[in-house]
Regions:
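Non-Sec secretion/translocation targeting segments of pathogen effectors
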Residues: 1-13, 24, 206-208
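Phosphate-centric recognition/catalysis
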Residues: 16-48
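Divalent-metal-activated hydrolytic enzyme cores
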Residues: 16-19, 106-208
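Conserved mixed alpha/beta catalytic, RNA-binding, or beta-rich assembly cores of soluble enzyme
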Residues: 42-89
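Acidic, glycine-rich active-site loops and adjacent beta-strand->loop/helix elements
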Residues: 71-72, 100-104
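Secondary-structure boundary elements
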Residues: 87-92, 122-126
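Short glycine-rich phosphate-binding loop at a beta-alpha junction
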Residues: 92-100
Length: 208
């Protein structure tokens, strides 16, 4: 088995279509329900169907962890402990990713939970990239992380409520900006859409 090297600390965030995401060799699924761990430390992990939930992860010098936090009443009431468990899951954190949530009346706890997690990441981690508040009513995001390559793979979808079919949501920088209410890319991160890098000069408003 190859020994995993420390990450470069310039993480790649790569938005890919669902067809590519579904074929990836993914292990260590992080689920949102209370019957399974919602925070997981591993070299590879992934999570799916983040809608009004908050997802993401933390990368340290020698370890990484991911999370998927449901916006239910129990998590809302226990968010302080949840945040502590997330921030303590990795020693010497270098970068973090926070994604998801919806700013809608049907999910009143979604943005408060997201905001508290985002603020905690900003306090405890030097470099944080944020993809905040999915605009699409039936939008969702999946993610996977591989510490060996230090790459976050993100997949955004619109789901047809009539037949459940998936519609690709991100084809370029404009559609990415239309999918989220706010995007902020950390100085240590690089953004890619379908393998093509988006440089700060291409969209300066989203780069810190």
């Amino acid at each position: 088995m190859d020994r995993i090297q420390s990450p470069s600390f310039k993480s790649k965030i790569n938005f890919i279509p669902y067809g590519q995401f579904s074929k990836m060799n993914k292990i260590n699924l992080i689920k949102f329900d209370h019957q399974h761990p919602n925070i997981l430390k591993a070299d590879k992990f992934w999570s799916a169907n983040i809608r009004s939930c908050t997802g993401g992860g933390i990368v340290g010098k020698n370890e990484a962890s991911g999370y998927h936090i449901w916006d239910d009443e129990a998590n809302f009431d226990g968010i302080k402990n949840i945040i502590g468990n997330i921030t303590n899951s990795v020693k010497e954190p270098v970068s973090a990713l926070v994604i998801g949530a919806k700013d809608i009346k049907e999910a009143p706890r979604s943005m408060p939970i997201f905001t508290k997690i985002r603020n905690a990441m900003n306090r405890n981690v030097p470099n944080v990239s944020v993809f905040q508040a999915i605009k699409e009513d039936f939008g969702q995001i999946h993610y996977a992380y591989n510490r060996k390559d230090d790459i976050w793979y993100l997949c955004c979808e619109k789901v047809n409520p009539k037949n459940g079919n998936s519609i690709p949501a991100v084809r370029g920088i404009k559609s990415l900006q239309n999918f989220f209410s706010k995007i902020s890319i950390a100085p240590t991160d690089r953004l890619f859409i379908k393998g093509k890098e988006v440089l700060p000069k291409d969209c300066p408003e989203i780069f810190k």
